[in-house]
Each structure stands twice: as C-alpha cells, then as structure tokens.
C-alpha cells in the first residue's frame, strides 16, 4: 500500500560467531537425514581361523549352503554342433543253410592273413634330439695342444701329463711321457683335469692317425666255461699290452721328450706329483 512504508533490506553483516552457529545447525540436520537404520553387515558363513584358512571345508560349506538344491542348466550354444558319423565296424550278412542261423556278423576291417616271424622295432620320433655320436665336442679355452694337465682321478691322479689332441668322442689324448712319470698314451675326460699355464710347442709332432677311440676301446676278455676243457680250469684271460701299443708309445714319446729336454727343469716338473698341503688353498693357487 501507498501509506505503508517499504521494508528496508537487512544490509548489516552477520558476525562470524553467528555464522558458525548457523553452519552447526545445518550440519546437525544433514546428520539426522543420513542416519538410517542398518541391518547386519554381509559376511561369509565360513569364519576365518587364520588368513587363508576357513573353519569349514569346501564339502562342508556345500552342504551348509544347500548348494545341492540348486538346478544347473548348461548354456545353450547358438552354433550347431556337427554330428559325427559313426563308422560301422561290422556288417550283418545273410548266410544260406537251415542249420547256419541265417546271418553272420562280419568285420569290415579284416585282420592281416600273415604275421611277421620277428618283431620289427618301430622308429620313434626323436623330437630334434641328436645321437651321442653327433653331439658337438667343445673344448675348454685353457686346453690347447701341448698344455700340461694335472690328472685328478684314476690310478694316475696327481700326475702331470702332456695334452696331444681331442678325440672324436670328446675325450683328451694325453701322454706322460711314459719314461718320466709312467703315464702311457691314454684317454681322459676334460672334467677331471686342471689345465696349467705351462705349455710345450708340439706343432711338429706327428701323431699316428689310427690313435682313435676304437684304438683305445677296452676289449672284452673271454670268460672260461665249464664245458670247454677241464672242470677245474677256471683261470681268466689276462690283459696283455700289444706290440702295436709299444711301437706307438715310443714313436710319440721320442718326439715329445726332445722338446721337454730343451726346456730347463721341465723334466723334474713332470716327474713331480701334485698334492695340497696345509696352508695351500686350491682357489688361491695359480697353476
């Protein structure tokens, strides 16, 4: 109305204490709205005894949950499965004669008429595996022709020998020489030798070509039988060194001994036997 005075807007600023009181009232109203009655929180029916281990087993939980009452149905696939055509193994054929029963069941796949007298072994797939004869024979970088090696096993353990060459089987051909340390021409594995830094130049030494693995292969000695000869004649055949071995030993050693004598103190070094004494540690020894 024209006679009434218009109300003036409240331009006075509220004090900070009043603002805090208003904010507190609003927060209480929000909390009242948020508070809703809650039920029991969801938890497993199998209480945990220790981390990862429950009180009940899987079979016990199967019965506790009554999972046996559930009906499971396999999902229907949209792709139609092709039905496999069964190949018949037999065929029923009619047979004449009153007393023959009228029919016979005959196999479609006939068995072979004749069988081999001996079983022929069938070759199996090797899956890329090579036979032992075709394995790559790697030689240690420290072992070269003329290197003096220390044998660690066998009857000649501790003795120093001269390395000649590597054979086809991967074994090392070594010699003492025989006159110095009683080690003949023989084979040894590179696992069981220590390569020293001492070397001899054997570039001019001629090693016979027939010194191969078959040359050193151990021959089987004949065992006596009671049928042959007398009953009490039970002496076994003894191993004897062949003349060929003696000739080859002299031919190789004569060439190597000349080169050994040219180096001072090398003969005594090859005669000496390697051994560890107190205070000598193998990992600190320089060979």
From Swiss-Prot:
<dbReference type="GO" id="GO:0031090">
    <property type="term" value="C:organelle membrane"/>
</dbReference>
<comment type="subunit">
    <text>Component of the large ribosomal subunit. May bind IPO9 with low affinity.</text>
</comment>
<feature type="modified residue" description="N6-acetyllysine">
    <location>
        <position position="238"/>
    </location>
</feature>
<keyword id="KW-1017">Isopeptide bond</keyword>
<keyword id="KW-0687">Ribonucleoprotein</keyword>
<dbReference type="GO" id="GO:0003723">
    <property type="term" value="F:RNA binding"/>
</dbReference>
<keyword id="KW-0963">Cytoplasm</keyword>
<dbReference type="InterPro" id="IPR014722">
    <property type="entry name" value="Rib_uL2_dom2"/>
</dbReference>
<dbReference type="InterPro" id="IPR041997">
    <property type="entry name" value="Ribosomal_eL6_KOW"/>
</dbReference>
<feature type="modified residue" description="Phosphoserine">
    <location>
        <position position="126"/>
    </location>
</feature>
<feature type="modified residue" description="N6-succinyllysine">
    <location>
        <position position="206"/>
    </location>
</feature>
<dbReference type="InterPro" id="IPR000915">
    <property type="entry name" value="60S_ribosomal_eL6"/>
</dbReference>
<dbReference type="GO" id="GO:0002181">
    <property type="term" value="P:cytoplasmic translation"/>
</dbReference>
<protein>
    <recommendedName>
        <fullName>Large ribosomal subunit protein eL6</fullName>
    </recommendedName>
</protein>
<feature type="modified residue" description="N6-succinyllysine">
    <location>
        <position position="93"/>
    </location>
</feature>
<dbReference type="Pfam" id="PF01159">
    <property type="entry name" value="Ribosomal_L6e"/>
</dbReference>
<keyword id="KW-0256">Endoplasmic reticulum</keyword>
<feature type="compositionally biased region" description="Basic residues">
    <location>
        <begin position="26"/>
        <end position="43"/>
    </location>
</feature>
<keyword id="KW-0832">Ubl conjugation</keyword>
<dbReference type="InterPro" id="IPR005568">
    <property type="entry name" value="Ribosomal_uL6_N"/>
</dbReference>
<dbReference type="GO" id="GO:0005791">
    <property type="term" value="C:rough endoplasmic reticulum"/>
</dbReference>
<feature type="compositionally biased region" description="Basic and acidic residues">
    <location>
        <begin position="1"/>
        <end position="25"/>
    </location>
</feature>
<dbReference type="GO" id="GO:0003735">
    <property type="term" value="F:structural constituent of ribosome"/>
</dbReference>
<dbReference type="InterPro" id="IPR049633">
    <property type="entry name" value="Ribosomal_eL6_CS"/>
</dbReference>
<dbReference type="Pfam" id="PF03868">
    <property type="entry name" value="Ribosomal_L6e_N"/>
</dbReference>
<comment type="similarity">
    <text>Belongs to the eukaryotic ribosomal protein eL6 family.</text>
</comment>
<keyword id="KW-0597">Phosphoprotein</keyword>
<comment type="function">
    <text>Component of the large ribosomal subunit. The ribosome is a large ribonucleoprotein complex responsible for the synthesis of proteins in the cell.</text>
</comment>
<keyword id="KW-0007">Acetylation</keyword>
<dbReference type="GO" id="GO:0022625">
    <property type="term" value="C:cytosolic large ribosomal subunit"/>
</dbReference>
<feature type="cross-link" description="Glycyl lysine isopeptide (Lys-Gly) (interchain with G-Cter in SUMO2)">
    <location>
        <position position="5"/>
    </location>
</feature>
<keyword id="KW-0689">Ribosomal protein</keyword>
<feature type="region of interest" description="Disordered">
    <location>
        <begin position="1"/>
        <end position="44"/>
    </location>
</feature>
<dbReference type="InterPro" id="IPR008991">
    <property type="entry name" value="Translation_prot_SH3-like_sf"/>
</dbReference>
């Amino acid at each position: 109305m024209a006679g009434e005075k218009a109300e003036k807007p409240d331009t006075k600023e509220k004090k900070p204490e009043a603002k805090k009181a208003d904010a507190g009232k609003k927060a209480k109203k929000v909390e009242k709205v948020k508070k809703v009655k809650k039920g029991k929180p969801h938890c497993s029916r199998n209480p945990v005894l220790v981390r990862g281990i429950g009180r009940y087993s899987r079979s016990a939980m199967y019965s506790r949950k009554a999972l046996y009452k559930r009906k499971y149905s396999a999902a229907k696939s949209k792709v139609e499965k092709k039905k496999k055509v069964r190949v018949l193994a037999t065929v029923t054929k009619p047979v004449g004669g009153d007393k023959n029963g009228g029919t016979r069941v005959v196999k479609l796949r006939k068995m072979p008429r004749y069988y081999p007298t001996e079983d022929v072994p069938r070759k199996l797939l090797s899956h890329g595996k090579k036979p032992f004869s075709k394995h790559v024979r790697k030689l240690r970088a420290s072992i070269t022709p003329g290197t003096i090696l220390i044998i660690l096993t066998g009857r000649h353990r501790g003795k120093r020998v001269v390395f000649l060459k590597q054979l086809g089987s991967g074994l090392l051909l070594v010699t003492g020489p025989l006159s110095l340390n009683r080690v003949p021409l023989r084979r040894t594995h590179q696992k069981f030798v220590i390569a020293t830094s001492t070397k001899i130049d054997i570039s001019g030494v001629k090693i016979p070509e027939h010194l191969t693995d078959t040359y050193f292969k151990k021959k089987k000695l004949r065992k006596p039988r009671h049928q042959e000869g007398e009953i009490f004649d039970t002496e076994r055949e003894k191993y004897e060194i062949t003349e060929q071995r003696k000739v080859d030993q002299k031919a190789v050693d004569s060439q190597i001994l000349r080169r050994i004598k040219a180096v001072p103190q090398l003969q005594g070094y090859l005669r000496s036997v390697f051994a560890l004494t107190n205070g000598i540690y193998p990992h600190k020894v320089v060979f």
